[in-house]
Amino acid sequence: MANKKRNVRNFSIIAHIDHGKSTLADRILENTKTVTKREMKDQLLDGMDLERERGITIKLNAVQLAYTSNKGEDFIFHLIDTPGHVDFTYEVSRSLAACEGAILVVDAAQGIEAQTLANVYLAMENDLEIIPVINKIDLPSADTEKVKKELEDVLGIDGDDVILASAKANIGIEEILERITEVVPEPAGDGEAPLKALIFDSLYDSYRGVIAYVCVKEGSIKVGDKIQMMATGKEFEVNEVGVFTPKTVVKKELHVGDVGYLTASIKNVGDSRVGDTITHANRKANEALPGYRRLNPMVFCGMYPVDTNDYNDLREALERLELNDSSLQYEPETSQALGFGYRCGFLGLLHMEIIQERIEREFGINLITTAPSVIFEVEKTDGEVLNIDNPSEMPDPQVVEQIREPYVEATIMVPNEYVGPVMEISQKKRGNFIDMQYLDDIRVNVVYHIPLSEIVFDFFDQLKSNTKGYASFDYELIGYQQSNLVKMDILLNGDTIDALSFVVHRDFAYERGKQIVEKLKELIPRQQFEVPVQAAIGNKIVARSNIKAVRKDVTAKLYGGDITRKRKLLEKQKEGKKRMKMVGSVEVPQEAFMAVLKMDDN
């Protein structure tokens, strides 16, 4: 048993987006002969269609590899692949909790970027052994010496420890594998102690129920064992355990340090919580493993099925997605404009887009989503404090004492020639300048405190387009601050459309109102009658525009003839339109709900 544990190595790969993490994982699978040449395809571990299309990793993945070192020792590796995007930090923290080591991949041409730093700090918090790798050294623009110096200066990593590699050209992979055997510690844990296994992910299979991905920290688990979930106290009998070599391979038993899966006829999605500890029902562990901190969503939006009959299917889809995405939150809500739907909370805009696309693809439900918003703290004149994530629920301005909004600390890394544009964008977004550090002759780290509601819209897009794509960006919540905010309502044909309401700073309200009214005028199709589009704060209209009516030429059949006859027909048409306007309702396309997002600041 001791021998079994001695040669297990659990590690993950951390990197900024596009620094070659998934390609390196592919090479490691190839070089350890885990996957044959015939089965190999790019981004092998990114199983979701979405991941392959966008070229990003969204879900973490775990694979078992067998490796024989140059000294002839046999090892079992567990590689846990992690996402690099700021929205998926929780996926990274979950996978790092199951490891003892991390390969830090840095692009030889790009150098250290904001999310590289964020992930390294996470790894250091988890006391992981870090193996630094400079990737893409075969690129013409590679500057390995500069990147080595950056690693030394910024992260305090010894330049001599850095492995130079190119995952694409298969350079340095062997050295990385050898280094893992030398420096990554074996999993600490007692094989004879009561079982403690951490659930770090799970998915739902309609035949087998919930499949839990587990990392065994102490004890062992085999088919037929009675297990208990420590958070819920529910008991189950294990009917299958196994590991992934990306394909699932059934095993008799999982030991200390193993990363694999188990099924136990768990039919209810809520019974297998990510971050929970599994133990034996008849020989319980004294205390649960420290799980994951529950992440609070930062961005909210309404999701409504286009076809109202899909409402229950949408609930089921959200339940399934919540199973392995613990940061997704949702609750039912109704809108006068859109009917029944859900108010959903996400970690960021990319997270929101991905969930929306997964619902549309995997469950075939057409959605209308409203523009995203954040949680505002509203203090009323009677002292009551409300947390409001839906702008249409903002109380009347007369009863509001003050509104506080969430602020984030934004860390922006950028080449020094673009510091000007970055500061300009940040100031425009109501940011407060905090700090600026030169990492070397070329790269600058700029820190701002910015309201989250400004970042939610198009901050990242503007940052990228004004720095030719060179800026990288990471942010974390720092708390709430009072701001002079107002709720803006949009009226179509005199009716308030609740799903189009948004919260805006009073200084920009007039300008924003004008922009959105013009935008909606372009997006909403012309009706048979004239439709006024208005933006209002409370009872005060701040902007208005009219969508002109489509006019049928009623006089076409007249030939020459009398002007009074013409007038009579036009009067008759006008009467008809008046009637229609009273009963007419305006069709609003999906683009109109997102118009709030696409405001150009020019």
Curated annotation (Swiss-Prot):
The keyword Cell membrane applies. It is found in: Cell membrane. SUPFAM superfamilies: EF-G C-terminal domain-like, P-loop containing nucleoside triphosphate hydrolases. Its EC number is 3.6.5.n1. GO terms for biological process: positive regulation of translation. Its main location: membrane. It is a peripheral membrane protein. Transmembrane segments: none annotated. The keyword Transit peptide does not apply. Pfam families: EFG_C (PF00679), EFG_III (PF14492), GTP_EFTU (PF00009), GTP_EFTU_D2 (PF03144), LepA_C (PF06421). Required for accurate and efficient protein synthesis under certain stress conditions. May act as a fidelity factor of the translation reaction, by catalyzing a one-codon backward translocation of tRNAs on improperly translocated ribosomes. Back-translocation proceeds from a post-translocation (POST) complex to a pre-translocation (PRE) complex, thus giving elongation factor G a second chance to translocate the tRNAs correctly. Binds to ribosomes in a GTP-dependent manner. Belongs to the TRAFAC class translation factor GTPase superfamily. Classic translation factor GTPase family. LepA subfamily. This is Elongation factor 4. It comes from Oceanobacillus iheyensis (strain DSM 14371 / CIP 107618 / JCM 11309 / KCTC 3954 / HTE831). The gene is lepA.
